[in-house]
């Protein structure tokens, strides 16, 4: 896997958006912010993408809705190239899917793995969020 080094957040980084978590929603939000021309990073406490599908690794873990409905629909090429092996995919397959999406869209370069949010404070004077993490501070317009 092609992951960012743990805690790779410069001390006074400023971006348009900070997203907490690299699960389904966090990966989509990073993709969406980039497509709008925004600079963004994702802060993820784990050492890889996946969110729930990274953390919940127990026998029999699987999706409880049809997997095709669980897939991203914003990339027709991705929809065409990824074939689910089961109607209700298992945790390992869903995690592989999210890893594939992160790699295909080069999302990992803007994800800070093994990084926890310690606080987020709105600064009235600058109209920005001041986010303190386990690896440093970040200033952003949007905290998601």
List the model feature ranges, each with a label:
Residues 1-17, 35-36, 64, 96, ...:
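Extreme N-terminal leader/targeting segments of oxidoreductases
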Residues 13-42:
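N-terminal Rossmann-like FAD-binding beta1-loop-alpha1 element of flavoenzymes
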Residues 34, 54, 103:
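Short polybasic/polar patches that bind polyanions
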Residues 39, 54-97:
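Glycine-rich active-site loop/strand segments that organize a redox cofactor
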Residues 50:
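Short alpha-helix immediately C-terminal to the canonical SAM-binding loop
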Residues 84-143:
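Feature captures the FAD/FMN-dependent oxidoreductase FAD-binding
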């Amino acid at each position: 896997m092609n992951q960012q080094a743990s805690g790779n957040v410069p001390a006074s980084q400023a971006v348009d958006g900070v997203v907490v978590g690299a699960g389904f929603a966090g990966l989509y939000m990073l993709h969406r912010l980039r497509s709008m021309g925004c600079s963004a990073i994702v802060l993820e406490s784990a050492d890889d993408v996946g969110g729930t599908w990274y953390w919940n690794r127990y026998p029999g873990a699987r999706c409880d809705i049809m997997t095709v409905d669980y897939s991203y629909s914003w990339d027709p090429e991705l929809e065409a190239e990824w074939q689910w092996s089961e109607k209700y995919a298992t945790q390992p397959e869903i995690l592989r899917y999210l890893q594939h999406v992160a790699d295909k869209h080069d999302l990992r370069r803007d994800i800070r793995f093994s990084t926890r949010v310690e606080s987020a404070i709105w600064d009235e004077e600058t109209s920005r969020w001041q986010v303190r993490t386990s690896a440093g501070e970040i200033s952003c317009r949007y905290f998601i």
